[in-house]
């Protein structure tokens, strides 16, 4: 960790705990800042706050008192899930207190170069592939960011010989200032998080911030399958490389069942361990980033032929009395669920879906639901999804949550059927994270399998 002095003796407010807030508070405390943490969860239920208090950090829990901001803070580090129209954030901005997210802090203290991955879908798989390939090549890659490992915590422990492979959400990127990755990658751009950003334009602008401090010495990797991404190529100062399944590009592409990096043959498409066009795109994106790091082809092929996938992303759990069960809790938007559905036979498929209501409808999903054997709906969007199912004459059942959904639908199914949790919605109406939602689904599966 760079022992930077800019935070020493500075009064800093960390708003919102969870993993990233706790990591930021501990790092800032180590750097000599005067840290105050404010979290809405009551102290007696707040393990993170209790641990921070033991470290001598001031904690204020149970509410968000506006007058706290009268204490002349030099900086606010905001949990990325807290919106910018939150009264505490609005008050900070009115007082000209800079508001950042924890990934900006990670950049400031990191001795290691950063590969940053963002986009609507495929981030987690692509991030994991890149890290696995670099490590297979004998390099030292550290997963961090939105993938479950707080960026500042990983950056604190990393050395200059490491590489931080960082998954970045639009929420995190809204709170950067000087953040500059060595390599940035945008997997794709589709409609998402409109409840948070207010518009698709604002959402895409947040994603685009990943490259705002880059120069021609840095590399930006874009998905040339998508016109929207292709059109960004001349809007950055970074050196652009691409990936495509449709044409030869300066980067990685597939042609006639073969994968190339520029004119160099890498492997056969059929050798990829993960099926589907979207996973081919993820693999190509990972190849470009890996080749920029000087990775040998042997390491790329080793990982891409054996990669088993990511937890909560079309994760095969096993069978219950002849019914196959998949956990795709990471599908937090319609497009991700569409991609999941494309790999199954609808006539034998039961879909479990629902979650946070972001204000969108599900008309886009209708063509993918045709001939579905049945659905179970839950969460804030249950009514919208039920109406969609009824419109298509799909048998539909209501449930309270993902665990009960699995238990309650089993009697309706038969051997040979497949049960897929692919919510098409964020988890925050009932769960802290999509990981928590998926873990509870896995637990329900294990209990029912006994």
Curated annotation (Swiss-Prot):
Q: What is its main location?
A: cytoplasm
This protein's GO cellular component annotations are:
cytoplasm
Q: List, in alphabetical order, the Gene Ontology terms for molecular function in this entry.
A: ATP binding; UDP-N-acetylmuramoylalanine-D-glutamate ligase activity
* Top-level lineage group: Bacteria
UniProt catalytic activity: UDP-N-acetyl-alpha-D-muramoyl-L-alanine + D-glutamate + ATP = UDP-N-acetyl-alpha-D-muramoyl-L-alanyl-D-glutamate + ADP + phosphate + H(+)
Which GO terms of type biological process are on file?
Answer: cell division; cell wall organization; peptidoglycan biosynthetic process; regulation of cell shape
Q: What does this protein do?
A: Cell wall formation. Catalyzes the addition of glutamate to the nucleotide precursor UDP-N-acetylmuramoyl-L-alanine (UMA).
Q: What is this protein called?
A: UDP-N-acetylmuramoylalanine--D-glutamate ligase
Lineage of source species: Bacteria, Bacillati, Bacillota, Bacilli, Lactobacillales
Primary gene name = murD
């Amino acid at each position: 960790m760079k022992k930077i002095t800019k935070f020493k003796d500075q009064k800093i407010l960390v708003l919102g705990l969870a993993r990233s807030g706790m990591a930021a508070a501990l790092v800032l405390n180590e750097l000599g800042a005067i840290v105050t943490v404010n979290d809405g969860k009551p102290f007696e239920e707040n393990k993170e706050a209790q641990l921070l208090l033991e470290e001598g950090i001031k904690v204020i829990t149970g509410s968000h008192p506006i007058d706290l901001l009268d204490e002349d803070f030099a900086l606010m580090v905001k949990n990325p899930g807290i919106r910018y129209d939150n009264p505490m954030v609005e008050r900070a901005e009115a007082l000209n207190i800079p508001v950042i997210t924890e990934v900006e802090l990670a950049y400031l203290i990191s001795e290691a170069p950063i590969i940053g991955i963002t986009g609507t879908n495929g981030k987690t798989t692509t991030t994991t592939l890149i890290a696995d390939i670099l490590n297979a090549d004998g390099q030292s890659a550290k997963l961090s960011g939105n993938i479950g490992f707080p960026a500042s915590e990983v950056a604190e422990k990393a050395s200059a010989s490491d590489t931080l492979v960082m998954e970045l959400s639009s929420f995190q990127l809204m709170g950067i200032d000087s953040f500059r990755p060595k390599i940035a990658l945008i997997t794709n751009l589709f409609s998402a998080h409109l409840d948070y950003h207010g518009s698709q334009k604002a959402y895409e602008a947040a994603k685009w911030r990943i490259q705002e401090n880059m120069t021609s010495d840095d590399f930006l990797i874009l998905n040339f399958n998508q016109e929207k991404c292709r059109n960004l190529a001349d809007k950055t100062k970074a050196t652009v490389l691409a990936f495509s399944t449709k044409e030869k590009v300066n980067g990685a592409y597939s042609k006639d069942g073969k994968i190339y990096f520029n004119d160099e043959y890498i492997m056969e498409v059929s050798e990829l361990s993960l099926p589907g066009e979207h996973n081919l795109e993820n693999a190509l994106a990972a190849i470009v980033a890996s080749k920029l790091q000087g990775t040998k082809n042997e390491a790329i092929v080793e990982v891409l032929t054996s990669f088993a996938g990511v937890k909560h992303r079309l994760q095969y759990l096993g069978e219950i009395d002849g019914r196959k069960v998949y956990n795709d809790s990471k599908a937090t938007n319609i497009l991700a669920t569409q991609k999941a559905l494309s790999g199954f036979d609808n006539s034998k498929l039961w879909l479990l879906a629902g979650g946070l209501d972001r204000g969108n409808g599900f008309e886009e999903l209708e063509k993918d639901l045709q001939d579905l054997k049945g659905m179970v709906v839950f969460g804030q969007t249950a009514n919208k999804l039920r109406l969609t199912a009824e419109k298509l004459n799909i048998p539909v059942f209501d449930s309270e949550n993902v665990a009960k959904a699995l238990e309650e639908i089993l009697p309706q199914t038969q051997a040979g059927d497949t049960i897929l949790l692919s919510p098409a919605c964020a988890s925050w109406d009932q769960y802290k994270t999509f990981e928590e939602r998926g873990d509870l689904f896995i637990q329900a599966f294990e209990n029912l399998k006994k």
